[in-house]
Amino acid sequence: MVDPDQLPLLAEAHLRAYRLVNSKFPPIALFDDVADACEFETLYQLQALTNPRLQNETGRLELIARAEIPFGIPGCSYATAPFTHVNPAGSRFSDGSYGVLYLASSMDTALAEVRYHQDRYWSNVEGLSYERFVFRGLSCQFNEAGMLDATVIPMTDPIYDPDDYSQANRLGQRVKQARQLGLRYRSVRNAGQDCWALMTPRPVTSIIQTAHYEMIWNGCISSISAIRAV
């Protein structure tokens, strides 16, 4: 089992990375409309009086401390949403009880990661013969200072198992419990590339939309194309 205490800390480095979000999930305007936590609380209370869907839009706010939300940055909503709208099925470094912001070193890597998971999910939907999905491509600027460097772990380690996330989950839980900022690790879906698993959105300084990408599924993801230029 990987001991996070034995992983080296990353030095300060301001980087650009990429991710995809399904276009059916709009940005959460409330996160982007305020400059700090005090403004957020005031506006949230006011909107809650007239908007019965507000809680569904903002997600489970109890899962993230207000101090962790990077209010005032471009794309605060995109940075925060993974921590309030948590996939209960979990992910590589989460058991489903907390959120993780996943980033990739290139858009091709982000596409490869999403392609794999979309293929796996829709292949289990009985009777589905064709579907079209549109994703927003996001460009994220962040500082990896203080994160743990899991790229020193060989790809043969169980945390990199392509399907069994049990060991990666255990590592993620220990990193989360230790209040570490996140991990840099090797992409399992695009050899030679890196990904990041942020346990908090605090390192993010900007996250903006670039292009839209279309995926066509007809038994498998048969095509991916950009449908709007960066």
Q: Residue spans of the language-model regions?
A:
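A short, exposed loop/beta-hairpin motif centered on an aromatic-Gly-Thr core
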Residues: 99-103
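Internal, conserved structured core segments that host functional sites
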Residues: 105-107
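Active-site and NAD+-binding cores of ADP-ribose-processing enzymes
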Residues: 1-65, 69-94, 116-230
